[in-house]
């Protein structure tokens, strides 16, 4: 069995992928923030370097890059790339 996650995309990640959101499936026993990022990098290698410096928000709370948390299919998940410009 697996969980399906809706991932909200913003800024550069949204531009590169061309969508506001995407869906990712992860096995139930692998439904963690680290595995989600790993799978995103595999499916979308063109955003891999941006993901390295992006923030992950789960249910509107930022998750530390070194914190691997369990995620559920009903969680709101967002990838927040760094803001650039001037």
Curated annotation (Swiss-Prot):
Keyword Electron transport: no
CDD domains: Ubl_MoaD
Alphabetized UniProt keyword annotations: Cytoplasm, Molybdenum cofactor biosynthesis, Nucleotide-binding, Phosphoprotein
Pathway involvement of the protein, from the record: Cofactor biosynthesis; molybdopterin biosynthesis
Quaternary state and interactors: Heterotetramer; composed of 2 small (mocs2s) and 2 large (mocs2l) subunits.
One of the protein's GO biological processes: Mo-molybdopterin cofactor biosynthetic process
UniProt PTM: C-terminal thiocarboxylation occurs in 2 steps, it is first acyl-adenylated (-COAMP) via the hesA/moeB/thiF part of mocs3, then thiocarboxylated (-COSH) via the rhodanese domain of mocs3.
Pfam families with a match to the protein in the record: ThiS (PF02597)
GO molecular function, one term: molybdopterin synthase activity
UniProt name for this protein: Molybdopterin synthase sulfur carrier subunit
1-thioglycine: modified positions: 86
Gene: mocs2s
This protein's record includes keyword Nucleotide-binding: yes
Family: Belongs to the MoaD family. MOCS2A subfamily.
Main location: cytoplasm
């Amino acid at each position: 069995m697996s969980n399906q996650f809706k991932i909200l995309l913003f800024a550069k990640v949204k531009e590169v992928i061309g969508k506001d959101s995407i869906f990712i499936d992860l096995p139930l026993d692998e439904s963690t923030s680290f595995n989600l990022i790993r799978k995103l990098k595999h499916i979308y290698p063109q955003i891999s370097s941006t993901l390295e410096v992006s923030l992950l928000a789960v249910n509107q709370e930022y998750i530390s890059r070194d914190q691997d948390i369990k995620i559920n299919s009903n969680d709101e998940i967002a990838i927040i790339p760094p803001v650039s410009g001037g």
